[in-house]
Amino acid sequence: MELATRGKVKEVLFMNTGEGESSYVQNSSFTEKVASMAMPALENAVETLFSKDFHLFQAINAADLGCATGPNTFAVISTIKRMMEKKCRELNCQTLELQVYMNDLFGNDFNTLFKGLSSKVIGNKCEEVSCYVMGVPGSFHGRLFPRNSLHLVHSSYSVHWLTQAPKGLTSREGLALNKGRIYISKTSPPVVREAYLSQFHEDFTMFLNARSQEVVPNGCMVLILRGRQSSDPSDMQSCFIWELLAIAIAELVSQGLIDEDKLDTFNIPCYFPSLEEVKDIVERDGSFTIDHMEGFELDSLQMQENDKWVRGEKFAKIVRAFTEPIISNQFGHEIMDKLYDKFTHIVVSDLEAKLPKTTSIILVLSKIVG
């Protein structure tokens, strides 16, 4: 099934479910590190809410968009609650309530997510801040909440996913324009780069438009997304995962295990923007001001092991956890073990040349009044 429509992507875009060896719960260490790097921005956002007297409303409504199933969303809840308690003590204010909405697409494993919730995360109802948690399935590219209902929005490593594979990647004759690749590469024609940027522009604008209606004036958004430092979208730093996956798929094509047409017609619905591209879209939309924006780099392999096979296998599991549902939809569930085994071998070979660092973008926005 080609990912050419929004409805189809919604059905297959989610992290690996459950708590098994290939699950996102067991393989979210990298996004956990990214989230921890961005926690100061979230803490500052909560401080800002109190400086704008939102605590006088006695309840703060927060949403974590694209929450997935791992421990990261629990860290977000704990951080917001801890900062609210800190400000309550400083301001000697009365007991506050925190309502947290955890959102993701319908395929997300909400059962595992809620099973992981504990009193450690949400506390009890007699504390300074009473915390209530609710699941909200649906696409954040459209409306999810009533108008002017959210004070704080958080999203980590979700906004770079697209609603569909970019439009216009086949010629008038029906030929694939990104043949042999699943993302932008050095060999991709300019039209592929333009199509990806255009799709991200359209989708991120929809995201901002929906939030502009849901977030209260002066409310805050803290967004963390995968991005790039270079102005070139085919820079290896931003596309090496998709390059290595495409090589693994191509090898299985050469072995007759995957139809070549399936590779040629598959384009991953994801885009890693530059800081300039993100800034331009926010300013064009005009609903939010940029309070803070920065890019930071992390080693793609956040591991201490010296054994390159151990490191390669762990990295492959991390990638499998967030790519398998959408990859298996195109190429078949029965081929996944072979594909990711091949991917592991390719990663280990690349470790000799050292994998590029991964760039993340932190974006803190405030809803414009009026």
Curated annotation (Swiss-Prot):
Transmembrane segments: none annotated. Disulfide bonds: none annotated. Keywords: Alkaloid metabolism, Magnesium, Metal-binding, Methyltransferase, S-adenosyl-L-methionine, Transferase. S-adenosyl-L-homocysteine binds at residues 24, 67, 72, 104-105, 139-140. Expressed in leaves of cv. Kucha, but not in cv. Puer. It is an enzyme of class 2 (transferase). It catalyses: 1,3,7-trimethylurate + S-adenosyl-L-methionine = theacrine + S-adenosyl-L-homocysteine + H(+). Pfam families: Methyltransf_7. GO terms for biological process: alkaloid metabolic process; methylation. Its cofactor is Mg(2+). Binds 1 Mg(2+) ion per subunit. Mg(2+) binds at residues 178, 264, 266-267. 1,3,7-trimethylurate binds at residues 31, 157, 160-161, 226, 322. The keyword Membrane does not apply. Pathway: Alkaloid biosynthesis. It comes from the Eukaryota. InterPro entries: MeTrfase_7 (IPR005299), MeTrfase_capping (IPR042086), SAM-dependent_MTases_sf (IPR029063). One of its GO terms (molecular function) is metal ion binding. The record marks 154, 226, 270, 318, 333 as: Involved in substrate discrimination. Involved in the biosynthesis of theacrine, a caffeine-like xanthine alkaloid with diverse beneficial biological activities including anti-depressive, sedative, and hypnotic activities, improving learning and memory, increasing exercise activity, and preventing nonalcoholic fatty liver disease. Mediates the conversion of 1,3,7-trimethyluric acid to theacrine. PANTHER family: S-ADENOSYL-L-METHIONINE:CARBOXYL METHYLTRANSFERASE FAMILY PROTEIN. Caffeine is catabolized to produce theacrine in Camellia sinensis var. assamica cv. Kucha, but not in cv. Puer. Belongs to the methyltransferase superfamily. Type-7 methyltransferase family. This is 1,3,7-trimethyluric acid N-methyltransferase CkTcS. It comes from Camellia sinensis var. assamica (Assam tea). The lineage of its organism: Eukaryota, Viridiplantae, Streptophyta, Embryophyta, Tracheophyta.
